[in-house]
């Protein structure tokens, strides 16, 4: 005997469980309840206490039970034999059916004269003989119908009852893990116990459960605590969501992190010297190889200053590349705003400032073209102060560096300032982990297939790594750095061009490296399938229609607005009025203002910042309309200022009036007019299209010009009022407050349908 429960031991020594527990407490042995297990040495101490030997008593009791059962079985067998003999004797007195039956009955009589020892053997031989006879006859015979009470002529063997041997249970595990929940059966399997035992423990805890019932975390912990088993809940991470991999970088141990180069974006107005500045930094002629001297794509380059590196993204400054500039601002640590000293702040300079502020990226102002006689840096500083960029010399926090990109003056100072800001920002990454980052640009090359320029933001990217990029996947076949040389690996903040993807990703997509190609393939295929099903489902753009819904769900903390008007004075008045809107939970933030038409640049900025565009006395141009439809940007056009304020305030409070859309349901041609006193002019009409209904609105059209719009007064057919008249039928129509109807007029019927807000 190894272990025994308290209540089992109490039963063996004819004691109550309470008495045994009291005896154990006197022996300084702590037990929780009657289900507790007792070790062998504890049982020995209890035996001495109670002066009993439980194991021997159990053995004697088992022997007595077996002897009693065998005696009762013997008596039962004797009575069965006696009854069978009587039945067989009565069976012989029945008339003979055929020789086969006669032989069977005679065999049975002879069997009765033999001892009980050979009864079973004889019975089996008889059955075999019967089967052999049937086989000799070609299977044409039939089995003899069993005698009543004989049960087919087969005798059941008396069962010998043996004492059950207890099955040794497996040892309890030290620790179990689960995800969210476990059923009773699953928990029992993990604990190496029977489900009935778990159900019993749950019942003792006041929980009624079935074998397939799911148990929550608290119930699992209580059961495991009773067994002394440690519990750990596993949290499953959706590896197909690439953003979760970026969130995990925040949980890395500080000891694993090392300093990384800063990623810098150069922004500014057209021809203010962005590419020339980068050209001076790299000492290469990038501008000479570009069409028209304007950068045609996002280029990523890395330069060395002393013993440290700096990564530059040359974001195009032309208005047609506003979207690319918005993407570039999202992956950078620092923005260099290039402003020409002889030109000052221009519209695209303001847009660049707004992009950087929206991305919460620090700005260093590089005042370029200082070598020109007309250079006026004080004017530049004054204009930038109006946009929130106050120089350090004037008590602000913005660093201003005067440079001449063409002559290379001030470049060293600019690089020192970049490294200084980067040092303050404590830019770090873990180079020992699997790489992740962002796509800067991608294209399909005829010779190399899918080519993507990647910026590694964390970890180290190596040749041969299985990679998932956006909704595509592959294996890094080759890597080329910004100097055109092949490399085998790229660390944090390093731009590289890779090949080996099965499709062309989109610029701005995230990329993550996985441990094996199988996982990368599964994740890539899953993401591609979900993208197809959702039809490139993106984050829902905020509109005035869904603003309150997003506020209710806690998705909106700030309402970004872009305000455009016909004159600058109106812009300032609208901006001031909009900033005064006070609704609990959401702040109004105006990220860009300007005088003039709504352009494609405004739509691009709104898409990048999830903003609403408000136009006052201005309209979007063709390109802006198309871009707004593609990006899902909400444009609101108004001519009265207070209506703008009222609409936005009501949207924030969820009180927007429903939208209605006009739907033309039919037309009728006036073929005869009848003037009736006290009624007016009745138009005898013929419905040519659709139908005319009693509750529809109507407009009278004469020579393709609308001369009146109102409501129907009466609609009749043969003096009877009707609800509607369909196409091909004649009717009489009178219009409220309008009698100037002439033959040949067209009466157009329409209804106003409420449009469901999306």
Swiss-Prot record:
GO cellular component: cytosol
G5: annotated span: 404-406
Annotated localization: Cytoplasm
Keyword Cytoplasm: yes
Domain of life: Bacteria
Biased composition (Low complexity): 96-136
Gene3D superfamilies from the UniProt entry: 1.10.10.2480, P-loop containing nucleotide triphosphate hydrolases, Translation factors, Translation initiation factor IF- 2, domain 3
Record-linked CDD domains: IF2_eIF5B, IF2_mtIF2_II, mtIF2_IVc
Positions with biased composition (Polar residues): 60-78, 86-95
Start and end residues of each stretch annotated as Disordered: 55-168
Location of region: G1: 268-275
Segments for region (G4): 368-371
Residues that hold GTP according to the record: 268-275, 314-318, 368-371
Keyword Flavoprotein tagged: no
Any GO molecular function: GTP binding
Region (G3): 314-317
Protein keywords: Cytoplasm, GTP-binding, Initiation factor, Nucleotide-binding, Protein biosynthesis
Pfam families named among the record's database cross-references: EF-G_D2, GTP_EFTU, IF-2, IF2_N
Family note: Belongs to the TRAFAC class translation factor GTPase superfamily. Classic translation factor GTPase family. IF-2 subfamily.
Function: One of the essential components for the initiation of protein synthesis. Protects formylmethionyl-tRNA from spontaneous hydrolysis and promotes its binding to the 30S ribosomal subunits. Also involved in the hydrolysis of GTP during the formation of the 70S ribosomal complex.
Family matches, as NCBIfam families: IF-2, small_GTP
Database matches in HAMAP family: IF_2_B (MF_00100_B)
Record-given protein name: Translation initiation factor IF-2
Organism, scientific name: Lysinibacillus sphaericus (strain C3-41)
